[in-house]
UniProtKB/Swiss-Prot annotation:
It is an enzyme of class 3 (hydrolase). Residues 152-155 are annotated as: G4. GTP binds at residues 13-20, 90-94, 152-155. The lineage of its organism: Archaea, Thermoproteota, Thermoprotei, Sulfolobales, Sulfolobaceae. Belongs to the TRAFAC class translation factor GTPase superfamily. Classic translation factor GTPase family. EF-Tu/EF-1A subfamily. This is Elongation factor 1-alpha. It holds the Pfam family GTP_EFTU. The gene is tuf. It comes from the Archaea. Mg(2+) binds at S20. Residues 90-93 are annotated as: G3. It comes from Metallosphaera sedula (strain ATCC 51363 / DSM 5348 / JCM 9185 / NBRC 15509 / TH2). The keyword Hydrolase applies. GO terms for molecular function: GTP binding; GTPase activity; translation elongation factor activity. It catalyses: GTP + H2O = GDP + phosphate + H(+).
Amino acid sequence: MSQKPHLNLIVIGHVDHGKSTLVGRLLMDRGFLDEKTIKEAEEAAKKLGKESEKYAFLLDRLKEERERGVTINLTFMRFETKKYFFTIIDAPGHRDFVKNMITGASQADAAILAVSARKGEFESGMSLEGQTREHIILAKTMGLNQVIVAITKMDVAEPPYDQKRYNEIKETIEKFMKSFGFDMSKVKFIPIVSITGENVTKRSENMKWYNGPTLEEALDMLEIPPKPVDKPLRLPIQEVYSISGVGTVPVGRVESGVMKVGDKIVFMPAGKSAEVRSIETHHTKLEKAEPGDNIGFNVRGIDKKDVKRGDVVGHTTNPPTVAEEFTARVIVVWHPTALAVGYTPVVHVHTASIACRVSEIVARLDPKTGKEAEKNPQFIKQGESAIVKFKPIKPLCVEKFSDFPPLGRFAMRDMGKTVGVGVINDVKPSKIEIK
């Protein structure tokens, strides 16, 4: 394990905007892929006549390796810069990418947003159906304020390497991000050609007009978020493994507090208590885990079937809250008609995804002031924000955003799209007996 400070990075962006190629190039330039793997990927890409996609092939190779080897390794892409040790969360290109992005983004410290400069591709990413828009909204909801916008495929802009095209894209995205409340001093824009590595780790000879940082330099300008070590322990479960000779090994990231070997913990909403026998991260044993650590931990007295993804771990002295009902401030980002009482989207919060019924629309808010504009409206439409009460269909752990931000912000999904995003103001707890 590197002694450098550690950051979790997520790579987001519209399909075909060059996420995989960018990540592959970065890992290769930083020397975190061996020659043999690179050669094999190049040959595989050549065979299929997709030479320009050799870096994307590299990632797929890594993905297969991960699927074959059942390690407790949540993430498989790690690299170092001069200043930091990075883990890349969840390779892009998943069928359930947005769903995974929601759970992944809730664990990330910063994001790289890949945006293609190719004519038509940028425009489709920013269309109403586009994922560039959707991913920007989700990144903001999930509390990701540090974003590096990589404007990719500058070599196929028209004309190639065109500064005007770069500026046009930058201005459009800046305007959109500002409208969602991003602090633009924490957002960097970089024109990139991943396939040749221009402005990834080395400066581009073709874009002399750009004098900002390379991607690698921008990564070193990121800041480490403060660790909430003084708060109670909260660890949402990402996966649960059963490993022969070891036992049950849940995996997840510590969001707040500290977990130590020997601690008495409880899994909610299951209400199952256990003792922590060992903790490890990236195959290194730890005596204690702090916020930001992606860990696998072995527990005594728990069967694999007792716990699942979306459960939250806390100490028995301060168990995570299970909500009978919760109240949130919601923005409707997409809906063909309107949302009324009884509407039941799937709520994605930390690593959980549970259908929740709208039990009351308390008030519609004035978008300019955020103050109440109408009490108990019949419905809310796209672009509107409101205070809404939800009732989870199945037991669900959530917390007030002001107490535990990662467990207090969520996205609502329906019909394969993000319908809305929200922040929880209040939770009515349900009584769960600890076994």
